[in-house]
Amino acid sequence: MIPRSYYWLLLASTLLMASAFVVSKLFIVDGIHPLVLVASRFTLAGALAIIWLSLRRQLETPKTLSDVGGVFLVGTLQTAVLFGTGFIAMEHLSAATISLLTLTMPIWVTGMLALINRKFPPLLQLIALGVGMAGVALIIGSGVSQAGMGELQWFALALVGAACWASATVFTKTSGLSITGWSLNAWQMLVGGGEVLILALAMDLPGIKLVLVSDILLFIWLVVPASILSFGFWFSALKLGGAAVTSGYLFLIPLFTALISVPVLNASFAPMQLLGGVAVGAAVWLMSRSPT
């Protein structure tokens, strides 16, 4: 029997992850460059997580060149590319839309594993793939009809990020890395954040200027609760409920993002966007119920 704490961990982690999209959008609207925000957030979050794990003597370190390469690959795909593309797209799209497109990751994973294993997915997964693709089409179609074809590139950019996250997930599932959980997340955040930091410095982008107390508090929230704690709670939930069941609740992230966006960002959504969001959420839920 799954303990009640599992659902509290699940609720806390998805709510914190959702808040990260909204807070990031606030900073981007205020003029902070998306790449600078990614670099600052994840370099600091990764460093703090590594220090915290070291103090608790729970930090796992890469032991072979294969592990080092694996950590760099995951960090590049799951932090640098995922959030780099997502935050750039967020300059033009709503936080809820980016959240929805990012959370198509389980759908991409299913397709990739089917190609790698050369095995036809189970019927329920095929249904989920179809529903998910229809949902993405509705979200993109509604957005393009409102803003024009010029916005299509930003939807595509967010989907590229989701596909890269899926690639990192497939790699961690199949590579047998010796580093897992909290430690892998800490290292990959530091690596990905560091890569984007180097890029931001090379582009001579202006740094973050946090003048108001509210800005400082929001940035602390973005780094600690919305980055370090959210993933920590998520890993704890995975241990209690298993990956299959837990991944079915990923749809809560775009749902919470949309709910928070309404009062904080004065967001509004077209009926087709809402229908597409429901379809993507249903697809993720169906994926978790499908036999592997």
What spans do the regions from the language model cover?
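C-terminal transmembrane-helix exit sites in multi-pass transporters
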Residues: L48-L53, G86, M105-G130, L255-L275
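Hydrophobic/aromatic residues within transmembrane alpha-helices
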Residues: F27, L37, R41, A89, ...
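Transmembrane alpha-helical segments that form core, pore/gating elements
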Residues: A49, V109-G111, L115, Q146-D204, ...
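Helix-helix packing/entry segments at the starts of transmembrane helices
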Residues: S13, S40, T79, F83, ...
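Hydrophobic transmembrane alpha-helices of multi-pass small-molecule transport proteins
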Residues: A49, P121-G143, V196, F251, ...
